[in-house]
C-alpha cells in the first residue's frame, strides 16, 4: 500500500503546545530588557495623542501581595490596550517613600534618633531602607510582565520630588488654604510625643465607668419639647463615660438625630436617656420605680444647653452620627481636644478644641483647683469624688475594657489636642470647588462618585502636619512671639525648595535660619513639622506629572487604585490639585475591589488563605495571573484560590491551542505571495474572517470601557465556539488534503492569517508573554514586537446582500448542531464510529432546503459527514429525528456507503477507480496528481 502521508499538508510549527510559562517568561523578560522594549514603544508612539495613566505609588515596605498584582496588571492592560488603540501611553511607576512604617523599621534596627544616632543619620538610614524595598518590589512588578519606565521610576524621596512637594504646599498657602489649629492625636506621656496608629497596641485596662447628669439650663424649654408640665425636680441629660479625667475638657453632649429620647421621672429628678436604653440604665443605677413622661427625636433637642457639673459653664446638645445604642445612655460626653470623633463633630459645630493636659500627662495650671498638676490617670478618682459632691453622679462601677497603649512603653496613652497645620475645606471654598470638580470626572464603577462626594461633603479640615523625622519638612518660619507665618513665606519656601532639590530634605534641618533670613533670624523659628505622607502622594500630579518630560505638560487621564483610595489617594490628590489649580487632577478614576479567597473570606496570614503572586508566577506563570485578573469582574471583590487559578489555566490552554492551530496551519504560507483576494476566497473563509471582525468590534469596545472580563469572555467564545467547534473543525479536511498551492487551501490560510493577526493583538494587553511568543512565529514581515503596533485593520466580512451572508451561516451552524446530536446518539448506540462513517439526509421545509442545496456537494464538508442529502420535510421516515431548534428540519442517519479513503478518511463509491492510485478516492487523486479540487463555499 502506498504511503500518502507525504502528500498531505500536515500542520507544523515550532510554537510549543505547552506554555511552560514559569520557565519561558524570564527569558522573554530578559529580551524585553536587553532590547529596551519600553523605549522602542515610546519611540514608535512619539507624536501620537497621549493617554496618561498616573501610577498611585505603593508604599516602599515589604514584598508585593496579590492586591498589588491586581492593581499593576489592570494598569498594564489599560496602558497596552491604549497603545494598540493608537495612543502614546507612557507609564511611569512610582513609590511612596517617607513616613512611619519605614521609620519603625529603622528604629527597630538602630533605635530612635538621639545624641549618639543623630536625626540626620536616621534619615539617611530611612532613605537607604526605602531604596532596598523599592528594588525588591520593582523586580516582582517587572516579573508580572508590566511594561514601564522601571529604570527611571518616580520616588517621593527623589530630591527633585521632595522640592516639588514643598512648592505644592507653597502654592496652597499662596491660595489662602492653610490655617493653624489644634487636633487630638494619640499621645504617649512617657515618649512625650504623638504616636501614629501603627505605634498603638491594645491591652485590657480597668477604668471607672460613670453615669453623669448635666442639668438643663432652661427647664421650661425642655418640658415644652416633651409636651409635659408636671415634672418632679430638675431635668438632666445623662452621659456615660469610662474616662472621667476628660470631663474638664467637655464642650458638648452628642445625641443621635433619629433616636427616640425619653424623659424619665425617677426619685426627685427627671433624666433624659435614649428610649431603647432606659431599662438597662435603670438597672445599672439601681432604680426600680420610674415613669416615662414623654419621648422626642434627638433632632428636637439640638442646641439646648446643659450645665457642666463642675466647670462653671454650660454646653450644647449637638447631633452626631457616632452615637450608638451599644452601651451607655445614648448621649455622649464630647471633648474635642480628647477624641477624634469628638474633634470632627466639634469642628462642625465650631466648638473649642480645649486641651487642659500638658505633654507629661498632667493638668495644666488653671484647669481646676483640685486637678492642676495631677496626672490624668490619677485624676479619675478626684473627678468622681467631685461629681459626687456636686450631686451629678448617678452611678460608678469598675469596668475592664480594651485600651490603647504605647507599643514601646506598653503604658496607656491619651488623646491630646496639639497645635497642627490644616488645609481648610471652607475658608477659601475648597470643599465647594472640589464637589464641583468631582462632577466633571468619570467614576468607574459609577458608585464611586457618590462615595467620594459624601466623603468630601462631610470631611473635616485636613491636618497635614506630622511630628516625625522621616518626611518632607513643611519648611515654614513662624514669628516666635505671634506664631504668625513670615510675610515672605512663599519666597522663603522657594529658597528652601532649591536647596532640597540639590541635597534632599536634610537641607532643611541643616539650614541655619540666618542664611536666608539674615537679621530677622532672631525673631523667627523653624517649624519642625513634616508633611503627612498623603500630602507627598497627593501632590504627585504636580511634583511628577507636571514635570516629567514624557507627559509633555498633559494632566493625567486616569487614576486607578483599590476602592479604599476614595478616602486615600483619590481624596488627597483632589484636595491638593483643587487647592493648587482649582481643578481635579484626573479625568477618569477607576477602582477595583479587594482580593478574597474562594469562599469570599478576607485574605489573612492567620487563616492561611493568602495567595502569593510570586508562588503563582513560579508555578503557573505570570500570564495565568494576568488572565485571572482580566477575567474577574474587578468592580466587586476578586476571588482567588488554587482552584480559580486552575480554571484560568484551563482557559489559557484553550486560547493557546487556538493560536497553535492557526500557526501550525500557516506552515509554508507567505502573505506577500500566497494571500488570496477576498472576492476569490471560499465563502466560509470570508465568514470566518467576518467572525473575527465582529469579535474585534466587541473586544475593542470592551477594552475601551475597561471591561476586561468581557474581553476574555468574547475571546473565549471566539476561540471555543466560532473557531474551535465549527470553523477549525470543518477546514481540517481542505487544509490537509487539498493541493498545497491551490486556491482552496490558500484561501483557508489567508483567513487563518487574518485571524491570527487580529487574535495576537487582542491577547497582547492581557496575555503579554504568550502574544509576544505567538508574534515571533507569525509569517510575513513585521515589527519586532506586537506592542509597537495597533489593532489589526485587515479584517473584512460578508455583505448582508450576499445570499450566503452571516445569517445564512448562523442557520447552518444550527443545522450542524442538530446533525451532531444525531451522530452522537448513533455513536452511543454503536451504529457509527466517527462522523465520517455517517451519511445524513436532511428533511426540510422549502426555504431551508434552498439554502442547503445551494452548497451542493460541499454541504457534507460543513457537516463533517461522508454524505449529505436534502429531501422534502413531508417525506421524512418515522425514525428521522425532529429538530428542537429548527422546526422545519428532521435528520435521518445511515452508514455511509462505499469504502474509506485512507488519505482523506471519507467513505466514497469511487475509491480505487483510478488505476495509478488504486487505494484513494477520486477527489484525493485530483489533489495528488491532477489540478486539485475546486471549493467555492466550504
Swiss-Prot record:
| Residue numbers binding Zn(2+) | 901, 904, 921, 924
Q: What is this protein called?
A: Isoleucine--tRNA ligase
Coiled coil ranges: none
Q: Where along this sequence does the record place binding of L-isoleucyl-5'-AMP?
A: 561
- Role of this protein: Catalyzes the attachment of isoleucine to tRNA(Ile). As IleRS can inadvertently accommodate and process structurally similar amino acids such as valine, to avoid such errors it has two additional distinct tRNA(Ile)-dependent editing activities. One activity is designated as 'pretransfer' editing and involves the hydrolysis of activated Val-AMP. The other activity is designated 'posttransfer' editing and involves deacylation of mischarged Val-tRNA(Ile).
Tell me what reaction this enzyme catalyses: tRNA(Ile) + L-isoleucine + ATP = L-isoleucyl-tRNA(Ile) + AMP + diphosphate
Listed GO MF terms: aminoacyl-tRNA deacylase activity; ATP binding; isoleucine-tRNA ligase activity; tRNA binding; zinc ion binding
Locate the motif 'KMSKS' region: 602-606
PANTHER family, sorted: ISOLEUCINE--TRNA LIGASE, MITOCHONDRIAL, SOLEUCYL-TRNA SYNTHETASE
Q: What is known of its domains?
A: IleRS has two distinct active sites: one for aminoacylation and one for editing. The misactivated valine is translocated from the active site to the editing site, which sterically excludes the correctly activated isoleucine. The single editing site contains two valyl binding pockets, one specific for each substrate (Val-AMP or Val-tRNA(Ile)).
Amino acid at each position: 500500500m502506498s504511503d500518502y502521508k507525504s502528500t498531505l499538508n500536515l500542520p507544523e510549527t515550532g510554537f510549543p503546545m505547552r506554555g511552560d510559562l514559569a520557565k519561558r517568561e524570564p527569558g522573554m523578560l530578559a529580551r524585553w530588557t536587553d532590547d529596551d522594549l519600553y523605549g522602542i514603544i515610546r519611540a514608535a508612539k512619539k507624536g501620537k495623542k497621549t493617554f496618561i495613566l498616573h501610577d498611585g505609588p505603593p508604599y516602599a515596605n515589604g514584598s508585593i501581595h496579590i492586591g498589588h498584582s491586581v492593581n499593576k496588571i489592570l494598569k498594564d492592560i489599560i496602558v497596552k490596550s491604549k497603545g494598540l488603540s493608537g495612543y502614546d501611553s507612557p507609564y511611569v511607576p512610582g513609590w511612596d517613600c517617607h513616613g512611619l512604617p519605614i521609620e519603625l523599621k529603622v528604629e527597630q534596627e538602630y533605635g530612635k534618633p538621639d545624641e549618639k544616632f543623630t536625626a540626620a543619620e536616621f534619615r539617611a538610614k530611612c532613605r537607604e531602607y526605602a531604596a532596598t524595598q523599592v528594588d525588591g518590589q520593582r523586580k516582582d512588578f517587572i516579573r508580572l510582565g508590566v511594561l514601564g519606565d522601571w529604570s527611571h521610576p518616580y520616588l517621593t524621596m527623589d530630591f527633585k520630588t521632595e522640592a516639588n512637594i514643598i512648592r505644592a504646599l507653597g502654592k496652597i498657602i499662596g491660595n489662602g488654604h492653610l490655617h493653624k489649629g489644634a487636633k487630638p492625636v494619640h499621645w504617649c506621656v512617657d515618649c512625650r510625643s504623638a504616636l501614629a496608629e501603627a505605634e498603638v497596641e491594645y491591652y485590657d485596662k480597668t477604668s471607672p465607668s460613670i453615669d453623669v447628669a448635666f442639668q438643663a439650663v432652661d427647664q421650661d424649654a425642655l418640658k415644652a419639647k416633651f409636651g409635659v408640665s408636671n415634672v418632679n425636680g430638675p431635668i438632666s441629660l445623662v452621659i456615660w463615660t469610662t474616662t472621667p479625667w476628660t470631663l474638664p475638657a467637655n464642650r458638648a453632649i452628642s445625641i443621635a438625630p433619629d433616636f427616640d429620647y425619653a424623659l424619665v421621672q425617677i426619685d426627685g429628678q427627671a433624666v433624659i436617656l435614649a428610649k431603647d436604653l432606659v431599662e438597662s440604665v435603670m438597672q445599672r443605677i439601681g432604680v426600680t420605680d420610674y415613669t416615662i413622661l414623654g419621648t422626642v427625636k434627638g433632632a428636637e433637642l439640638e442646641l439646648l444647653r446643659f450645665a457642666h457639673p463642675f466647670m462653671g459653664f454650660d454646653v450644647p446638645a449637638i447631633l452626631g452620627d457616632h452615637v450608638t445604642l451599644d452601651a451607655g445612655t445614648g448621649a455622649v460626653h464630647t471633648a474635642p481636644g480628647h477624641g477624634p470623633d469628638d474633634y470632627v463633630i466639634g469642628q462642625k459645630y465650631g466648638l473649642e478644641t480645649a486641651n487642659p493636659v500638658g505633654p507629661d500627662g498632667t493638668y495644666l495650671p488653671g484647669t481646676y483647683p483640685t486637678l492642676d498638676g495631677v496626672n490624668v490617670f490619677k485624676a479619675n478618682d478626684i473627678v468622681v469624688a467631685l461629681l459626687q459632691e456636686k450631686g451629678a453622679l448617678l452611678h460608678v462601677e469598675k469596668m475592664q475594657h480594651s485600651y490603647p497603649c504605647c507599643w514601646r512603653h506598653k503604658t496607656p496613652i491619651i488623646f491630646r489636642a496639639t497645635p497642627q497645620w490644616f488645609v481648610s475645606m471652607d475658608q477659601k471654598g475648597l470643599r465647594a470647588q472640589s464637589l464641583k470638580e468631582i462632577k466633571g470626572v468619570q467614576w468607574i464603577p459609577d458608585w464611586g462618585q457618590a462615595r467620594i462626594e459624601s466623603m468630601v461633603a462631610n470631611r473635616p479640615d485636613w491636618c497635614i502636619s506630622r511630628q516625625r523625622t522621616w518626611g518632607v519638612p513643611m519648611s515654614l518660619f513662624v514669628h516666635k512671639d505671634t506664631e504668625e507665618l513670615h510675610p515672605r513665606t512663599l519666597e522663603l519656601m522657594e529658597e528652601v525648595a532649591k536647596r532640597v532639590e540639590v541635597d534632599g530634605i536634610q537641607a532643611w534641618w541643616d539650614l541655619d535660619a540666618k542664611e536666608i533670613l539674615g537679621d530677622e533670624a532672631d525673631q523667627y523659628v523653624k517649624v519642625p513639622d513634616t508633611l503627612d505622607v498623603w500630602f507627598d502622594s497627593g501632590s504627585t500630579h504636580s511634583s511628577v506629572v507636571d514635570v516629567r518630560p514624557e507627559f509633555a505638560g498633559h494632566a493625567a487621564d486616569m487614576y486607578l487604585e483599590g476602592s479604599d483610595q476614595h478616602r486615600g489617594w483619590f481624596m488627597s490628590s483632589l484636595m491638593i490639585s483643587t487647592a493648587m489649580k482649582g481643578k481635579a487632577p484626573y479625568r477618569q478614576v477607576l477602582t477595583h475591589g479587594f482580593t478574597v479567597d474562594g469562599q469570599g473570606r478576607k485574605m489573612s496570614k492567620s487563616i492561611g488563605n493568602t495567595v502569593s503572586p510570586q508562588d503563582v508566577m513560579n508555578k503557573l506563570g505570570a500570564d495565568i495571573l494576568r488572565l485571572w485578573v482580566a477575567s474577574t469582574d474587578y468592580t466587586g471583590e476578586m476571588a482567588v484560590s488554587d482552584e480559580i487559578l486552575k480554571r484560568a489555566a484551563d482557559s489559557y490552554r484553550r486560547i493557546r491551542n487556538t493560536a497553535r492551530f492557526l500557526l501550525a496551519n500557516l506552515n509554508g504560507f507567505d502573505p506577500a505571495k500566497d494571500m488570496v483576494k477576498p472576492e476569490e476566497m471560499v465563502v466560509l473563509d470570508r465568514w470566518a474572517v467576518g467572525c473575527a471582525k465582529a469579535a474585534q468590534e466587541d473586544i475593542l469596545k470592551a477594552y475601551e470601557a475597561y471591561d476586561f472580563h468581557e474581553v476574555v469572555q468574547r475571546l473565549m467564545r471566539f476561540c471555543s465556539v466560532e473557531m474551535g467547534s465549527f470553523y477549525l473543525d470543518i477546514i481540517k479536511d481542505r487544509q490537509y488534503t487539498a493541493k498545497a498551492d491551490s486556491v482552496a487551501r490558500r484561501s483557508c490560510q489567508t483567513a487563518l492569517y487574518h485571524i491570527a493577526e487580529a487574535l495576537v493583538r487582542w491577547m497582547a494587553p492581557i496575555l503579554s508573554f504568550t502574544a509576544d511568543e505567538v508574534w515571533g512565529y507569525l509569517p510575513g514581515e513585521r515589527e519586532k514586537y506586537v506592542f509597537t503596533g495597533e489593532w489589526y485593520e485587515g479584517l473584512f466580512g460578508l455583505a448582508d446582500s450576499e445570499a450566503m451572508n452571516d445569517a445564512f451561516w448562523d442557520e447552518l451552524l444550527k443545522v450542524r448542531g442538530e446533525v451532531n446530536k444525531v451522530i452522537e446518539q448513533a455513536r452511543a448506540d454503536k451504529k457509527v464510529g466517527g462522523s465520517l462513517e455517517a451519511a445524513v439526509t436532511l428533511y426540510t421545509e422549502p426555504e431551508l432546503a434552498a439554502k442547503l442545496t445551494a452548497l451542493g456537494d460541499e454541504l457534507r464538508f460543513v457537516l463533517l459527514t461522508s454524505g449529505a442529502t436534502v429531501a422534502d420535510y413531508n417525506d421524512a421516515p418515522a425514525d428521522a429525528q425532529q429538530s428542537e431548534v429548527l422546526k422545519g428540519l428532521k435528520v435521518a442517519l445511515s452508514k455511509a456507503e462505499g469504502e474509506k479513503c485512507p488519505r482523506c478518511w471519507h467513505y466514497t463509491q469511487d475509491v480505487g477507480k483510478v488505476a495509478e492510485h488504486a487505494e484513494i478516492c477520486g477527489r484525493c487523486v485530483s489533489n495528488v496528481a491532477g489540478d486539485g479540487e475546486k471549493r467555492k463555499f466550504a
